[in-house]
Amino acid sequence: MTKRYWNIDLEEMMRAGVHFGHGTRKWNPRMAPYISAKRKGIHIINLTRTARFLSEACDLVFDAASRGKQFLIVGTKNKAADLVSRAAIRARCHYVNKKWLGGMLTNWSTTEKRLHKFRDLRTEQKTEGFNRLPKRDAAVLKRQLSRLETYLGGIKYMTGLPDIVIILDQQEEYTALRECITLGIPTISLIDTNCNPDLADISIPANDDAIASIRFILNKLVFAICEGRSSYIQNS
């Protein structure tokens, strides 16, 4: 994998609060190599390590995108939902930003059926098929469509399992991470000081609570994906 320069600036990371971990009582000892200090009762993340692993992750997604691979971004915290959808759409990635439905990947055949149902209902709505139904039946189908849009809207164009999954909060998205591990899907995960750094293929130590920190990491990854996609288009 070719190493590239991604302009990952330590001062910019500090301004985004990437270095702020959790309280010192709420930590995973396996995170010790990624912690540089304790300050006012919280752990401080070593940003040199963050920059190294973020750079590795950018190299990985660039290479994958330049070969036409598919990505799934998972971040279901309410405050990050809009950020996730905007970033994913910009990089033409699939995303889950509301709730991870158990078995979404490990029970892919069921997910496919839901996606087919979702597409059928969207077609019905666009062709005004609901207007030809009794009001009660139309209301039931509209509720179904609304629910499917909420939970599957970000993966509506997904036709198979993703090649790489980006997870923005290891603890919040633990079910998604376990499904990826079960299926052998490579993962990139943000890890705060209360996380296990050994679960993902590339773990990026960072504050996973502050929106500015999440935005900084995600923007770097999305930029690398977009650059890789441009390379793929030029070479195809």
Curated annotation (Swiss-Prot):
Transmembrane domains' residue ranges: none
Cell compartments where the protein resides: Plastid, Chloroplast
Coiled-coil residue spans: none
Keywords annotated in UniProt: Chloroplast, Plastid, Ribonucleoprotein, Ribosomal protein
Cited Pfam families: Ribosomal_S2
Family matches, as HAMAP family: Ribosomal_uS2_B
Entry similarity comment: Belongs to the universal ribosomal protein uS2 family.
Name of the protein described by the UniProt record: Small ribosomal subunit protein uS2c
Lineage start: Eukaryota, Viridiplantae, Streptophyta, Embryophyta, Tracheophyta
Gene for this chain: rps2
